[in-house]
Structure formats: C-alpha cells, structure tokens
C-alpha cells in the first residue's frame, strides 16, 4: 500500500510483475520501547541502527527469498545503469534501508553482499534510495514497460545520452516558437 503513490512501481506490483515484501525491524526491537538504535560504541554523534534487531529481521526472511542483500549506503558504490541491469537479473533481492548515522558494521560484514549509493548527498533514510533502486531495476523486468524495447534506448543504455531535443506533436502555440 505504501507504494500506491509511486505510480509505476505500484502498477508493477498490482500486475504481479514484481513483489515487494516489507519487514519492520521494530518487530525485532530489543525492548518494550521498540528501540532499534543506539549511540555509537566508543562515542560520536548521532545514532546507529543496532545489530540484533537487524540480524533477526534478516533471519526472519525465508532463506530462499533472501537472495542478494544490498545496503543502501552513502559509502556504497555509486549506482549506474550497468549495476541496475545486473541486479534486474536476480530472482530475489533484499534491500536494507539505513537510518540515522548508519547500521552496525557487524551486519555489513556478515550479511550484506553489497553497499550501493545513489549519489553524493544525504537523505533522511535509505527508503528513498531503495525506491530509486526498485524503480530502476523493475523497468528491466519483462512486461513492465509498454514497449519492451524502450529500456534499450534509455538515456544511459549502451552509453547513450539523448542527443536531440524532444518535442510533442500537440498544437500548443503560446508564442513558444
């Protein structure tokens, strides 16, 4: 339901072309306050997502459905079209969305296959980056686009950048030329 406002991603779910299962790490919180974060061990600013609730959440995902585990992280490899195409070929993908200052390094070291960044800027949480990743990957799944060849000529496919100006054929005449 959360993806309803996401247009194409929601439509792809409704058509059963993709399946998105959300896991709430607060269900694996360590206390009655649903705490999933803690101050960094050794000091420092901000809060870090704790290892225990994250590990429990990962382990609660059916092993056969877990697949490749990606952590959306500003320290990760910058996402590009080649990576999108590679990830689109995977049967299952688990995306960990960080918050605060990040997640406990033990989770990264023992469970994460890959860290991915969508750019050199800060977001409130990894959910926004995950949505970008899901949308870009799902465009490459058969049946998601009206024209199956559309993604072959996308801006970044095969090193292409749009090399022409784009116009529509409507008769808008507002003195625009």
Where are the model-predicted features located?
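Long, charged alpha-helical interface segments
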Residues: 156-169
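Hydrophobic/aromatic beta-strand patches that form the interior of the parallel beta-sheet core
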Residues: 21-23, 70, 93-95, 114-116
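Structured adenosyl-cofactor binding patch, chiefly the S-adenosyl-L-methionine
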Residues: 107-149, 154
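S-adenosyl-L-methionine/SAH cofactor-binding core of RNA-modifying enzymes
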Residues: 48-97
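Short, glycine/polar-rich helix-capping loops at beta-to-alpha or helix-loop-helix junctions
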Residues: 100-108
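N-terminal nucleotide/polyanion-binding subdomain common to many enzyme families
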Residues: 4-61
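Fold-independent oxyanion-binding glycine-rich loops
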Residues: 25, 72-75, 97-100, 119, ...
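Single conserved hydrophobic/aromatic residue that forms the stacking wall/gate
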Residues: 1-10, 167-177
């Amino acid at each position: 339901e959360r993806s309803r406002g996401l247009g194409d991603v929601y439509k792809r779910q409704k058509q059963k072309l993709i399946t998105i299962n959300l896991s709430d790490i607060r269900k694996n919180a360590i206390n009655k306050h649903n705490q999933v974060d803690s101050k960094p061990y050794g000091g420092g600013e901000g809060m870090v997502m704790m290892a225990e609730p994250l590990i429990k959440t990962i382990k609660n995902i059916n092993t056969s459905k877990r697949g490749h585990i990606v952590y959306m992280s500003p320290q990760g490899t910058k996402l590009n079209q080649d990576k999108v195409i590679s990830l689109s070929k995977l049967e299952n993908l688990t995306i960990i969305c960080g918050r605060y200052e990040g997640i406990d390094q033990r989770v990264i070291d023992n469970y994460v296959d890959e860290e991915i960044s969508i750019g050199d800027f800060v977001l409130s949480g990894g959910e926004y980056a995950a949505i970008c990743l899901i949308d870009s990957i799902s465009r490459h799944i058969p049946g998601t686009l009206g024209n199956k060849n559309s993604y072959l000529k996308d801006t970044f496919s095969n090193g292409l950048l749009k090399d022409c100006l784009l116009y529509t054929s409507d008769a808008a005449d507002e003195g625009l030329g």
